[in-house]
Amino acid sequence: MSEETLTTEVETRTNFITHIIDEDLASGKHNNVYTRFPPEPNGYLHIGHAKSICLNFGIAQEYHGKCNLRFDDTNPVKEDIEYVASIKQDVEWLGFKWQGEPRYASDYFDQLHGYAIELIEKGLAYVDELSPEEMREYRGTLTEAGKNSPYRDRSIAENLALFEKMKNGEFKEGTACLRAKIDMASPFIVMRDPVLYRVKFAHHHQTGDKWCIYPMYDFTHCISDAIERITHSLCTLEFQDNRRLYDWVLENISIERPLPHQYEFSRLNLEGTLTSKRKLLQLVTDGIVDGWNDPRMPTISGLRRRGYTPASLREFCRRIGVTKQDNVVEYAALEACIREDLNENAPRAMAVINPVRVVIENVAEPEILKAPNHPNRPELGERDLPFTREIYIDEADFREEANKQYKRLVLGKEVRLRNAYVIKAERVEKDASGKITTIFCSYDPETLGKNPADGRKVKGVIHWVSATQNKVAEFRIYNRLFNVANPGDEEDINAVINPSSLIVKHGFVEVNLANAQKEQGYQFEREGYYCLDSKEGSADNLIFNLTVSLKEGFTA
């Protein structure tokens, strides 16, 4: 595959779709593979879209084919160029490059209009003037057949004239539409004379004010696939019944053969998250989150800001696979992918999130120590650690009294400082409320990189940061946004927001992190994996987001 088509190698597992493609190529039904990723630009992409992106681009890569990026932009009321830009950015960030220029369904509006006229001329479409309420009533239910519209038997000439009036803006919104003439008694509601065109007086981000009639998704999607010569149109299971309409439209218009075929796979249902764009938008507009890229959001941009890497999301999509069975994927499976990625690749650093001051009384002069940036990757080099008389440790790493299971600093006992010396807690200083403000210690200068010479055992190791050579930092500790496993089932999502989904703390990091780069993941030793916030963080305002805990099951 050429670099101009795809830039990322994706390992795909065999699945029912690859089996179908293998059969199509072997039989000569197709001699190439052409897929597409067709989002509607009415919101930011989420983790479910990542699965579709990896599937469509991954299959194109595996079969040395092509994959288009096409915006299904048929509803100008909900769409915006902001979403177009974000979608392009997300696809590229995940590591993919589409074939040629991005496509738009609106590129085909003239052709779609022509095919609509063809259906009218064949007696397969008519202009209906039922109100939306009447249309719902006439449509019937799953157990009751629909009934024909009183406008269904208009002549071809009358329908052509009325459709032209629709195009010319002579009907108000909701007063007329073009419907396919199929079967109002069909057991599949989607086939009960579905709407093909409706009137909308709205400015379109691509076509401006050229049109006041816009085609419906089901009419547009299949024709766009055929125009682009897509061989395998991959959709999620909720479009399974729509395949009948997909095939009906293509079989009844004069478009080049062979026709594309639609195949459905299960959508991604991730435990504890929402993928409804409407509900995600509600979180944004209600101020529950600070935007589509809030690190608690399941959007690709939110996961990116939180510190997820493209490789981790691609690996997650590979692991969950492609099936026809709906299931719920545990959130831990997603976390495992980023945890493994960062464990292997993230440089190490130390951060004290809940600081308490320590004075090492027998330190005479500051000393520069060396620490590896990664214990298993010597090629990543070393960093300088200033060891000073005053340091900070985490308040959870000290107790005045403790049992043998507590392997940290205890009054009168020793512990090792990470990448440094053994220290001993001698006494403490408290404020008027009894809170410890300072721990006074001594250190053994002969223990750098080795055990005490007299053979005494020091079991615990704690992290630390110099109190005089550091950088102040804010730490944003993210937990699940919802306190229920299936927030999508809730009527009022605001009622199930986890009040502890964001905990903000202030502390200190190594002075080296003054040069932290946005989206660079770090393992803050004994704390978790963090990255510099890409929206608000900077060298002068260090804000680190918790990407994932060091171990599964941790919550702040």
Swiss-Prot record:
It catalyses: tRNA(Gln) + L-glutamine + ATP = L-glutaminyl-tRNA(Gln) + AMP + diphosphate. The keyword Phosphoprotein does not apply. A motif ('KMSKS' region) lies at residues 274-278. A motif ('HIGH' region) lies at residues 39-49. One of its GO terms (molecular function) is glutamine-tRNA ligase activity. Its EC number is 6.1.1.18. Belongs to the class-I aminoacyl-tRNA synthetase family. Monomer. This is Glutamine--tRNA ligase.
